From Swiss-Prot:
Binds 1 lipoyl cofactor covalently. GO terms for biological process: glycine decarboxylation via glycine cleavage system. Keywords: Lipoyl. This is Glycine cleavage system H protein. GO terms for cellular component: cytosol; glycine cleavage complex. The gene is gcvH. InterPro entries: 2-oxoA_DH_lipoyl-BS (IPR003016), Biotin_lipoyl (IPR000089), GCV_H (IPR002930), GCV_H/Fam206 (IPR033753), GCV_H_sub (IPR017453), Single_hybrid_motif (IPR011053). Residues 22-104 form the Lipoyl-binding domain. It comes from Bacillus mycoides (strain KBAB4). PANTHER family: GLYCINE CLEAVAGE SYSTEM H PROTEIN (PTHR11715), GLYCINE CLEAVAGE SYSTEM H PROTEIN-RELATED (PTHR11715:SF3). The glycine cleavage system is composed of four proteins: P, T, L and H. Belongs to the GcvH family. The modification N6-lipoyllysine is found at residue 63. The glycine cleavage system catalyzes the degradation of glycine. The H protein shuttles the methylamine group of glycine from the P protein to the T protein.
């Protein structure tokens, strides 16, 4: 699967899509592939504040439990409730159906510090 050019990426394999003064966050195709079949996703509540580089949830696969690290700071304004009943969406549609949270940014400049698709591809040895 190709790496979408319209997103930014963290070194912890989260993607970020800018929508006005907010961002949508999910995990990358590379990350879901490393984790294997996702069986449970734990996400914060709407209204929670998340801090960049701090855990904001977790993803449980048949192999392991992995924490999700916030690529930016802000207030959670939406959570993808579908992942509660359909965690497999993370494997099936990491960039579309499996978005995890929408966050109102506290510092928009944090997005610019994230990796471009090209840099993320280099980091993960993907073309």
């Amino acid at each position: 699967m190709s790496i979408p050019n319209n997103l930014r990426y963290s070194e912890e394999h989260e993607w970020v899509k800018t929508e006005g003064n907010a961002v949508v966050i999910g995990i990358t195709h590379f990350a879901q592939g490393e984790l294997g079949d996702i069986v449970f996703v734990e996400l914060p509540e709407v209204g929670a504040t998340i801090q960049a580089d701090e855990p904001f949830g977790s993803v449980e696969s048949v192999k392991t439990v992995s924490e999700l690290y916030a690529p930016v700071s802000g207030k959670v304004v939406a959570v993808n409730e579908e992942l509660s009943d359909q965690p497999e969406l993370v494997n099936e549609s990491p960039y579309e159906g499996a978005w995890m949270v929408k966050v109102e940014l506290s510092d928009a400049s944090q997005v610019e510090k994230l990796l471009t698709a090209e840099k993320y591809a280099e980091m993960t040895n993907q073309d």
